[in-house]
Amino acid sequence: MPLTREFKETVQARLRADRKYRKELLREGVECLLAGDLDTGKAVLRDYINATIGFEELSRRTKRPAKSLMRMLSPSGNPQARNLFEVIHHL
């Protein structure tokens, strides 16, 4: 079931305002990836990126096209571990 727009906006607002919440959400995304829950980990990282630096800034930092980064973290994306670690490094 897709989340309502209001919920996503609420989470994004909290991420922008609360440093501890940002840190914990990023940690949760990484823990999901390490536990093998790739779908949840990618979704959490996507939300984190959208609410913080955005894909354009991540693209600048990683020197990878923003569309490639979005595709990598999409539900059908199948990123290599080194690419995920590179993204996490720049967050």
Model regions: which residues?
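DNA major-groove recognition helix of helix-turn-helix/homeodomain DNA-binding modules
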Residues: 81-91
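Recognition helix of helix-turn-helix/homeodomain-like DNA-binding domains
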Residues: 63-80
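N-terminal flexible/basic segments that precede or flank functional cores
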Residues: 1-44
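Short basic helix-loop element that most often maps to the first helix and adjoining turn
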Residues: 42-58
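Juxtamembrane/interface motifs at transmembrane-helix termini
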Residues: 43-45, 61-62, 89-91
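Short coil/turn segments at secondary-structure boundaries
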Residues: 27, 60-61
